[in-house]
Regions:
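Signal for well-folded cores of large energy- and translation-related assemblies
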Residues: 21-24, 43, 47, 67
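Ribosome large-subunit tunnel/peptidyl-transferase-proximal elements
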Residues: 1-25, 35
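C-terminal structural segments of small proteins and small subunits
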Residues: 52-84
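Alpha-helical elements of the RecA-like P-loop NTPase motor core of helicases
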Residues: 18, 40, 64
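Glycine- and other small-residue-rich loops at beta-strand/loop junctions that grip anionic moieties
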Residues: 5, 31-32, 51
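Amphipathic, hydrophobic secondary-structure cores in small proteins
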Residues: 36-38, 43-61
């Protein structure tokens, strides 16, 4: 997950969903402690759009990996990023 700090990305539910729907998502990282309904919705959307999903243990770890000081439920590396 070290690549998340330097990759061109978006963090959070709304921005991640938008990136997936607009075809800009290359890889989605989902925290496993997200509400199950949201987790299922995102996994289904990624499957439909052919976007790879990587699960992360918890939101705190994902936030840290993104280089932010708060928890993150999900993050999305954008397709034009060279770091993945």
């Amino acid at each position: 997950m070290e690549e998340l700090k330097n990759a061109r990305k978006v963090v959070g539910l709304n921005q991640t969903v938008r990136a997936i729907e607009e075809g800009q998502a290359k890889m989605v990282y989902l925290a496993e402690d997200v509400e199950p309904k949201i987790l299922q919705r995102l996994e289904q959307l990624c499957k439909e759009r052919g976007v790879s999903v990587t699960k992360v243990a918890d939101m705190k770890q994902l936030g840290k990996a993104c280089g932010i000081d708060v928890k993150a439920a999900m993050a999305c590396v954008l397709a034009d990023s060279d770091n993945i």
